[in-house]
């Protein structure tokens, strides 16, 4: 490799690296004496030592070298740190660049500011130990490992001038999500997207074990990366001077390769999938730290992972820490006031070219609203409730097609899914765009192309990670998935929800577009795939998160789905969960009624009720199939008990069930009581696990009267109606539940129970003989 560093520049870069390392160690250890102007004493050291040193010097090394590359070539670049436990490093570098003080003026660029910077790290009411939202320049906390590379590619999509430097920890590289993320290069189009520069940080160890990639040999490792479609550039060593020179040359080569790839695609029309560069950086874990502590090797081992000197009961450890800190020669790095030397600070880029101040790392600054068609234009027309059937997601697909079409020029909307866009009946979008694909295309393939905006790969992890990276850098997206398999990204959802919750309290973090899930092919219509495909529990998982972040919608029909989807696409800083079926189902509300109903979140369906001013029972429902079964149960009740008074309540926004003190969408007690009454039995048919409704309503006055039916982990490959029968959610069970709970009908219970069991026997015999549901179920329609 050619030498790109003069001796003077190399010396200054090494000093900058020493400064970042000094600040990183100071954050972990010191609460006073930040410039070591006094001999170090035990009272200068924090009582609780928290943080991770091992990865940090490598992260700092890369940061100073990327800064040189940015300044030399005027690059637009952001920095994603997979091993986010190296939080002190990014805090240190954002402080050295000045952006940290711009965001937090109390952390001045002097002695007092340094002391505050050190003391606040991993301190109560201070800042967390990882690369959290509080850290300027971060879009990826890296607490839970595995998602850095997917986030990096998501950030690069539709950002043609952006380079995303993504540091992948060699421990992180062992996760399933990261392992499949290498394939993201098959979806990156150099003609219109930015570039991702993966840098595998090969320091050899995790918390207590070696890493796989560090122990398979150089040839096998480079072969692996080539097999993934990359051209690896190896930088290795433990001599700082040598590593500075080889790393600078490696980055120049990588940039030249990136520019050549993009020029070929953008100016010469080359469409062949390129072999993108990536860097393998092999340096010691805990580099520049203590060689040994108490006779045990630290640098270059797993013992450097967290706090190398973990206890100061031995007085010699204070001297050991002081020696370590003074090895960075802080007196050469900071002036008498504690300010970073001007000639060293000048190495960093300025303004928005600083990675810690790049607007792509605060995507809300760049966010533009979507151009949305009028969803009313896609409404299902009907002459009355239950007079027409429609496939809700197919109706939504037509709307999303035109959302896609309306934003093609803006290049700020993509649809994500794990090979399910057509299955989930959203394939109308393929009328205006392809599925993105940079790999080989054969004659049999349909709607594949390098310019597609539908992102399909059979990895929920990649779909979620790409979408998060896309949203965090200021764009919009929509993720559709089979309901049962969204659990695969349950932990990723956790991390994104936590990120949003934290951002709400950080004034400089601008709101981003919401993460919108559409869960379909749901539990009640997975009769053809069986028990493995039947699980509505993601709703429970989402509800556990902060009320300021999560929203859950269960539209009962296509028009309600349109209204909900339009609302979600306009929203900011939420995770919106929509659950809707794809099979033909009866439609209940015209579009204007649907909008009113969705705006309220829950309400009485007067057209399905009678005697509702003084009902015998409230028949409540949430979800499309529970709504169908509830309305069918109402018809049965009128047949069984002609003078029965029934109020039908439908819930589309699940969070209205919580009190308004617990969730901003929650109904106040007065309105809840108006809908659900204060003393009447409520039979609640719910899409998911029944105990969730009890959790949401336990503070309500009439909670003791609420009886919930829902999924109770019964299912198989069977008929659609048998699915609800197996879980006691069928119309016959709901009708029996109502009769049992109406005091004046006590004399009817025995006959009603016998009728129910006779019907169940008839149902079982019929499906066993015919393999289909009884005509009275299959051909049912609403008779108002």
Swiss-Prot record:
Source taxon at top rank: Bacteria
Keywords on record: Lyase, Thiamine pyrophosphate
Molecular-function annotations in GO: aldehyde-lyase activity
EC id: 4.1.2.-
Pfam family, one: XFP_N
Cofactor: thiamine diphosphate
A single GO BP: carbohydrate metabolic process
Keyword Lyase part of the UniProt annotation: yes
Classification via InterPro entries: Phosphoketolase (IPR023962), THDP-binding (IPR029061), Transketo_C/PFOR_II (IPR009014), Xul5P/Fru6P_PKetolase (IPR005593), Xul5P/Fru6P_PKetolase_C (IPR018969), Xul5P/Fru6P_PKetolase_CS (IPR019790), Xul5P/Fru6P_PKetolase_N (IPR018970), Xul5P/Fru6P_PKetolase_ThDP_BS (IPR019789)
Recorded family membership: Belongs to the XFP family.
UniProt name for this protein: Probable phosphoketolase
Organism: Rhodopseudomonas palustris (strain BisB5)
